[in-house]
Amino acid sequence: MNPIKHMAIIMDGNGRWGLKHKNSRNLGHKEGLKTVEMVMKYCIEKKIKFLTLYAFSTENWKRPLKERNYLFRLLEIYLIEKLEKLNNEKIKIKIFGEKKFSEKLNSLLDFAEKKTTRNTKLQINLALNYGSKKE
């Protein structure tokens, strides 16, 4: 049995990576999502039960509106396209933070949590609009 039960990642630096390698912050965020998928696969292979992704902090509201909208749309598209696959792989989605997003994104987040609530292979703790100062 793997002694590691929980992995946590602060998703920071994707925009800077994107500027350096792709000349686009948005492409960096998109590549970061591919990395998340690789990490999820790794966690399942190694039987790590919990993966926390600190994805959007309360401080991230200071980013330009266009970038924030891109991040939220990226998450919406991911949930629409991948939720069934995540559910079939027995991955549970748990959201932490205040859901102060668009009605569409809030609905998708709620739906993802409800749809995957009984899954036990891997729990993804998604920290969105979350800040340690508020805790």
Language model: regions and residue ranges:
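Flexible, compositionally biased loop and terminal segments
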Residues: 1-135
